[in-house]
């Protein structure tokens, strides 16, 4: 009877060890895939991310928002001219330099507004260049090679009792579930950020029409800061995932397998929190409201 029980126990241990190793191997592989996937998603320009949505947004901006921006530009320029005349004692104290300055500012605004789309895309091209360079370094430095540690981990598991192995199996399954939750979190952040970019760029001509005005110019300046914040939010996301992947490397050298699994769980929750904070942090850095 003891012989039969030993065989069943040995079979269950082998089954649990194989399942635990499979879960942990998939866990490490998922980290590597997520780093590469985030680099592709957040590092893409609006045009490269989805050409169909990009074309629709540009068409709406050129045909609906741009005429409104032209009206706003004319209104802002007229109000500035009236204010300048009033401030100069109804032109009694006005010199040609002031008038030339107004003409120059208005001409600059007339040039900027029709080329708003090119200016906006240039901002994201700069951000994409930065993210591409950073993601290359991140993927190279945080790729976790499970082949180098799997033998030692199997030896540790083989020394454990059946009950402890079952507990580890449950824990590894739970941590694997959190990785799926993390994937959903990353999906929401990356796709939500791109949709926000499309929404912001669709109305770009309106704030850009106010850039040349002294009083209304804050609207355009804050809009540009918001664009840079959205662009460089991708860089912060890359850094968050890179830090996470480096921290997860500790599971390969942790003596206590259970502690390693729960540490990985804690890092996953921390990553979700920091990813959601990247938007407010980027806006704070660029002082965008």
Predicted segments — roles?
Residues 70, 74-86, 237-252:
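Juxtamembrane "helix exit" motif at the C-terminal ends of alpha-helical transmembrane segments
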Residues 208-225, 252-254, 283-287:
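Alpha-helical transmembrane segments
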